[in-house]
Amino acid sequence: MSGVEIILSQNIDKWATLNLNLNGYQNIVEGFSVVNLYPQENTFTANRQEILSGSIKFNGNFRFKRKFELQLTSVYLAPDIVPQGKIYSRFSIDLGVKKLIQKDKGEIFLNATDLANTMRIKRTVQGDGFHYLSTDYYETQVVRVGYTYKF
């Protein structure tokens, strides 16, 4: 596997910082053969697969009046290959807010991951005599509320 990564960061005055991470790579799964002996002897052969894939991640940090901050993150993962198949593209958006209190020694925060519930792993797998399409739903939507204090 070989690839390239580009990271861009920009401060917008004192109120915002924007970051963009671009990642591209060539993924190769070499062809292979395997002999399964159980329950009966069966030879499986997979052809060589190759794909150009990558990801994009955007992160924005925004500072507002009264020590209030907001963070927005979005992630796109391009289609990729696995032995015997393919993983389709995935996307998610996360959001977090925090408020500094107690002379900046404490903070109250709220964050939520995968707001649109789009981080599903859809894949196809195929082989000699079978083909299936699946979508895995992990528990990616999480909301956290908390308080921290710095001594």
PLM region spans:
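Transmembrane beta-strands of outer-membrane beta-barrel pores
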Residues: G24-I28, S74-D80, A112-T118, F151
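Residues on the lipid-exposed face of transmembrane beta-strands in outer-membrane beta-barrel proteins
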Residues: V4-Q10, F58-F62, L95-K99, L110, ...
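Outer-membrane beta-barrel translocator domains and adjoining extracellular loop/strand segments
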Residues: E30-E41, T73, I81-Y88, I121-G127
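Gram-negative outer-membrane beta-barrel transporters
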Residues: M1-V75
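Short sequence motifs at beta-strands and strand-loop junctions characteristic
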Residues: R48-L52, I87-R90, Y137-E139
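Active-site lining segments that contact anionic ligands and/or coordinate catalytic metals
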Residues: G3, K67-E69, R90-D94, K105-E107, ...
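Outer-membrane beta-barrel proteins
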Residues: L8, N42-R48, G60, I81-G85, ...
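C-terminal beta-signal and adjacent terminal beta-strands/loops
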Residues: K99-F151
